[in-house]
């Protein structure tokens, strides 16, 4: 049976029979909220109660991959589909996911463990029997885009399961969002942001020409509310004598109506490019829609020969979850233009394979393992040699301290895709270390608890807070819990085998890109700082269902 959010908030407190607040008084029970004006979508539950897009009746409800899975680059290889998503400063990164039906996805593993910088939107390609992932990297030290110091790297392998080559600098600087294509001339190209293109070598590993402007984008009406014109995320599809160029425009964040999917086509890879007469084929038209800033699409043919768009969007009211992966069917018109037919994605849609019974997702309670590093826990902005900090034993994860606190400790974070969830972890402090449990956006914005043997620290908006106090220290062996109830985060603490005690609560809806930049998401995270180690044992994740 799934626990409700109300149950979870009171779980640690009910162990003691009462809730002790700062004054020692018992806390009042949570009151029942008034009914919402409209019912929320109902997802099927999967591992640990995580929401699952496959409804089990031949239909699906977006997102197909919940949580921060932005800028999907999708590739069909026989009966398999593979996807990569922007991984930013998280390493091991460039995690590959696999599907047979475009709805259910499971992780394969990371293709990149060497820290290069902030990894942005990638593309996957297969050429002459070999696999390639093209990786744009922002090399600015703070991961933000001032000056756009980008480089494009490539890794390659004989199999999508790896092993992957070390990253190779292609000599293409100042551009992002590579989209691989092969022209009618048999030559290989990367299409880039802002309508640019560059020819690459026959082996796909280096630049073989100059970057040139080939497409001006679709002219967005002046009265539309967008973030910026920003042509980006180019993907090339060759079909029926045409090359189709799918692009994102309008800006990936900002107002809800910003992002969109536009299409152009040409008889030649060299242009000229003709814009689709019914652009944009996908766009959030108003702030009442369930998915905001929809864009950055990859077109892909489904198992039955039909056509689909895989793209990202923000969930209305839950920007903290990041840009999630959405799936929408599209048709071809009589004059060979794509036309999306999913509407605003408010309800279920027929699955590409109605009777498929594929597995989906990742058990987050099982990520304290070496073989889950990258697909589960990832280091944020790690230093060289970062993998040596983590030792995995039958007892759990032993993490060496780094820095003085969460901001410079390179926390280990993981993606959570549920509107409400709880995370619990048992830990032991070894030596002169300190560490704990966070909700982590980046090294400047986080909240949570950190413990030393003689002190308990609370963090809010990226810094330690002294009021209200999180309470007294609880020793070297303790447990921490966070309940994130639709962007209201409550942290609990207990000494070994003692009752739970509520420490602090925060409202965290503002921990998102539109407030803090960076394009990332709010993630549960573990950290260890100081001179010593933290032993993390028995991490448990559980999605929480609405009361009722």
Locations of regions flagged by a protein language model:
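Carbohydrate-active catalytic/glycan-binding domains of CAZyme proteins
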Residues: 1-2, 10-13, 28-548
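N-terminal export signals
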Residues: 7-27
């Amino acid at each position: 049976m799934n626990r409700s959010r109300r149950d979870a908030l009171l779980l640690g407190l009910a162990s003691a029979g009462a809730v002790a607040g700062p004054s020692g008084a018992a806390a009042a029970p949570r009151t029942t909220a008034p009914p919402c004006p409209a019912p929320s979508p109902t997802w099927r539950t999967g591992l640990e109660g995580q929401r699952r897009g496959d409804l089990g009746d031949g239909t699906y409800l977006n997102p197909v991959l919940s949580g921060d899975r932005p800028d999907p680059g999708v590739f069909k290889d026989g009966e398999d589909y593979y996807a990569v998503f922007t991984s930013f400063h998280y390493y091991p990164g460039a995690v590959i996911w696999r599907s047979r039906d475009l709805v259910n996805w499971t992780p394969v593993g990371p293709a990149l463990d060497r820290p290069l910088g902030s990894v942005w939107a990638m593309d996957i390609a297969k050429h002459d029997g070999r696999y390639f992932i093209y990786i744009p990297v922002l090399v600015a030290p703070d991961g933000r885009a001032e000056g756009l110091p980008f480089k494009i790297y490539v890794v390659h392998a004989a199999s999508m399961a790896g092993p992957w080559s070390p990253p190779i600098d292609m000599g293409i600087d100042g551009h992002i969002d590579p989209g691989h294509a092969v022209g009618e001339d048999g030559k290989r190209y990367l299409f880039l942001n802002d309508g640019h293109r560059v020819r690459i070598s026959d082996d796909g590993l280096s630049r073989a020409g100059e970057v040139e402007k080939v497409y001006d984008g679709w002219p967005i009406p002046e009265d539309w509310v967008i973030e910026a014109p920003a042509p980006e995320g180019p993907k090339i599809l060759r079909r029926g004598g045409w090359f189709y160029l799918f692009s994102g425009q309008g800006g990936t964040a900002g107002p809800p109506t910003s992002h969109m999917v536009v299409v152009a086509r040409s008889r030649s890879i060299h242009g000229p490019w003709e814009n689709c007469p019914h652009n944009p084929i996908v766009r959030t038209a108003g702030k009442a829609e369930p998915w905001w800033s929809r864009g950055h699409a990859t077109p892909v043919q489904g198992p039955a020969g039909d056509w689909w768009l895989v793209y990202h969007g923000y969930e209305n009211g839950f920007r903290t979850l990041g840009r999630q992966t959405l799936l929408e069917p599209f048709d071809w018109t009589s004059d060979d233009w794509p036309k999306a037919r999913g509407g605003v994605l408010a309800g279920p849609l027929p699955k590409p394979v109605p009777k498929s019974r594929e597995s989906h997702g990742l058990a987050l309670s099982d990520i304290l393992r070496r073989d889950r590093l990258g697909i589960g826990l990832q280091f944020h902005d790690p230093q060289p040699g970062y993998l040596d900090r983590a030792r995995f034993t039958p007892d759990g994860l032993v993490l060496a301290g780094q820095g003085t606190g969460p901001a410079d400790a390179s926390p280990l974070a993981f993606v959570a895709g549920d509107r409400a969830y709880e995370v619990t972890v048992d830990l032991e402090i070894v030596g002169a270390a300190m560490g704990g449990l966070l909700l982590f956006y980046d090294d400047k914005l986080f909240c949570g608890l950190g413990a030393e043997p003689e002190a308990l620290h609370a963090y809010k908006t990226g810094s330690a807070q002294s009021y209200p106090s999180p309470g007294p220290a609880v020793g070297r062996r303790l447990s921490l819990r966070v309940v994130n109830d639709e962007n209201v985060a409550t942290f609990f603490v207990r000494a070994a085998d003692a009752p739970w005690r509520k420490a602090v609560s925060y409202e965290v809806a503002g921990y998102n890109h539109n407030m803090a930049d960076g394009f990332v998401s709010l993630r549960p995270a573990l950290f260890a700082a100081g001179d010593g180690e933290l032993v993390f044992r028995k991490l448990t994740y559980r999605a929480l269902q609405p009361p009722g």
